Structures are given as C-alpha cells and as structure tokens.
Amino acid sequence: MERKKMQNDKSFLGKEPVGRLLFQLAIPTVMAQIINMLYNVVDRIYIGHIPGSGALALTGVGVCMPIILIVSAFASMVGSGGAPRATIAMGKNEEDQAEQILGNCVTLQLIISVILTTVLLTFGRQILLAFGASENTIEYACAYLNIYAIGTIFVQLTLGMNTFITAQGFAKIGMLSVLIGAVANIVLDPIFIFKFGMGVRGAGLATVISQAMSCTWVMAFLLGKKTYLRIKRRNMRLKKNVVVPTLTLGLAAFIMQSSESIISVCFNSSLLRYGGDLAVGAMTILTSVMQFAMLPLQGLGQGAQPIISYNYGAHNAKRVKETFGLLVKVNLCYSIILWLCVQLFPGTFVSMFTSDAQLLTFGKSALRIYMAVMFVFGIQVACQLTFSALGNAKASIMVAVMRKFILLIPLIYLLPHLFAKNPLMAVYLAEPVADTLSVIFASTLFAFQFKKAVREMEGE
C-alpha cells in the first residue's frame, strides 16, 4: 500500500464522530479483554474442580500469579510504551518513525523473553517459596510454572505486539488475536487436565499451546500487507532514541502490573500468617474476579487510546476532550453495575472457582470487602490510560506508584494491627481503602495535567 493511501486510510481517527468511533474501537477491544479474562481464569476454574485436590491445586497455581503478572508486565511495558508513540507519530504523518518504533519493540520482546525463561527455569522453585508457597502447595505451583515458563516468548509477543494492532484502529483483528488463544485454551484445558490426567501440568501445557497460536496470528498480521505499520528487519536494530522514550512511557504500565505481583506476594504472606492456605486460596479467587473487573476497563481505555493519541498528535483538542469525557462516563456505568453484582451475588462469582464449602463461605465475605469501592475505580483507569495516550510518562508513573507502593502495600501490613479483633479481614480491607485514596489523587492530578495538555494543543 502506498504511503499516501495509508495516510488517508488512517485519517478516520481524526474525522469520524467520536461517540461512534469510540464504540467501534472499544467494543471489539472490550470483547477481547473479556475473552482474555476467560483465557486467564479458565485454568483456575478447571483446576479448582479437580477431584480431591482442587483447593490445594488452586492455591498452588495462585502462588504462580505474581510471576505470571511480572511476565505480562514486561510485555505491557514494551507494548504500552511503543504503541501510543507509534500512533502519535502516525498522527504527525511520520510512518517511518512509527515503523522504527514497532521494529525496536519486537527486538525488545525477544530479548526479554530469553531472559525471563532462563530465570524462571533456573530459580522457579526458590521464587515460588519466597512468594508464599507452602509445603502443601509448592509441588502444584512448580508443576504449572515449569511448563508456563517455556512459553514466555509467546506471551511476550502476543500481549506486547497486539497493542500495535489495536493502536492502528484494527480492533477486530486485535480481538481475534485473543479469541484464537482463548478458545483453544478453553477446549484444551479439560482434555489435558482431566482426560489425559495431567492435572496442573495439563493446564500449563494448554496455556502455552494457546499462546503460541495467538502469537502466530499477531505476528502474521504485523508482517502482512493489511497493516499500516509493518515489521521490517531494518527497523529491528535497537536505537537508543527509540528504546529509551518507549521504555520510559511504558514504565507506568510496567509498574501497574509488576506492582500487582509485589502486592500479590504481600497479600499472600500476610494472609498465610493470619488465615493459612484457606485465606491464600480465597485471594486467588478474589484476584481472578478483579481481573474480570479490570480487563473491560482496560479494553475501553485501549479503544479510546488511538483516538486520543492520534488527535493529540494532530493538535485537535476538541476531539481529545470529547473522547476522554465519554470514556469516563462509560467506565463509571460499567463499574457501578459490576459493583452491584458483586455485593448482591458474591457467591455466583466465588462458586465459579471452587466447590469446597469452607472456601466458598469464606470467599463470599472476603469478596464483598475486597471490592467495596469498585464503583469509582473506572475514574482512575480512565485517567491512567489517558496519561499514557498523551505520552505523559511522568504523570502515569506517579498515579501507578501512589496507589500501589505508597498506599496499598503499607495498608496490607498496617490495617491488621489497627483492627486486631479481625486481622484477617483487615488485610482484604486494604484494597478498598487504597482505591478510594488513589482515585482522589489521580483525579486531582489529571485535572491539572489535562488542562496543560489542552492549552498546548490549542496554542499550536
């Protein structure tokens, strides 16, 4: 495709009505995120129902979650740092620069994959023990992680490079990237876990095969002729002026996801102290439900990101403001509906992951506390993703650091001492307290930074 034609094709991001455009991009992306949620939790759903050992196996795989989050965080750092910069370059009609960013990001993902796989295969058992595995759960955790580690390269390329597909406006293609792997995982899981009797090893193998299928789809598209930005060998040589800004912008996304890993370790250690394996197992369920809550919000933000980034690059302040306003409204509506469902029907969510009566009863009470202020969290997600879409790395990092490191981690250890009569539930209470304070901070910071960005666009 000729460069001039490419420019005309992508100009819809600056011309189509914002409302219609947002939903055209967001609905497939949200569907992809929901499918991705099933992709991530389907292992836990099947594992939790393994006869005789489901509860312990679920807890063991739950201990692997901090590691899986770190792997995803590296992919997100490269993808979330590179994709907005590439879209901004497209808005400025600088396709050569955009393809340079794309090529460098592929190389970064390959390098990161080799390093992560080596570390996990060499030190996996020691890491799991440090992350909260007990004598009862360590073998289940190792069985899953040893197989998952082999497929790290597929995770990196699928999650990291799929953002470049969505960022160009190919939301349906991005959705299919996730759908292919999700359907494969849902089909393969019961076959490997139950029919072949592989247990948690089967779940890990199903995940690796599914990710490989998604990876093949993503890379085939970005190497093909239908994409605006194409992977080319000459652009894969790392350049400092591309790598440093990309990783700097993606650092906020990395902090958000890797901090989830650190937080998971903190939760597990504190819960193991006050409630044993039962409390850690419940946390596996709570984080799975939280994934369900967060991924559609992330999908909406990813649908809005190309519109905001493109029009920011084109200095169209009106469309940027209109897109953000609509994003906040939709996020709030979704958050409120989900909050009501969790508070009214917690057992529906918990029973998806376990048939153990004790874990089911405990999990319902913990879930209500853990997601007590979910109804306002859509505001922070909208601010966070808009900061990234505008290329404001500093503000994105500030929001990420505030919620995770300054608020939540200290509260995990502080609240059990303040509520000594029920320290176990006080651990779960740390999440809603941190959410409330971080939403206030993110909204205040965004009010100042967004006005500044609008003035810059209007001043050009």
Report each predicted region and the residues it spans.
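Transmembrane helical elements of multi-pass membrane transporters/channels
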Residues: 24-43, 147, 181, 210-214, ...
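Small-residue-rich hydrophobic transmembrane alpha-helices
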Residues: 58-118, 155-174, 282-340, 344-346, ...
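Small-residue hotspots at the loop-to-helix junctions and early N-terminal turns
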Residues: 55-66, 141, 145, 204, ...
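Residue-level signal for transmembrane alpha-helical positions in Major Facilitator Superfamily
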Residues: 23, 38-39, 78, 119-123, ...
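Short runs within selected transmembrane alpha-helices of multi-pass transporters and secretion channels
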Residues: 79, 148-166, 177-182, 203-216, ...
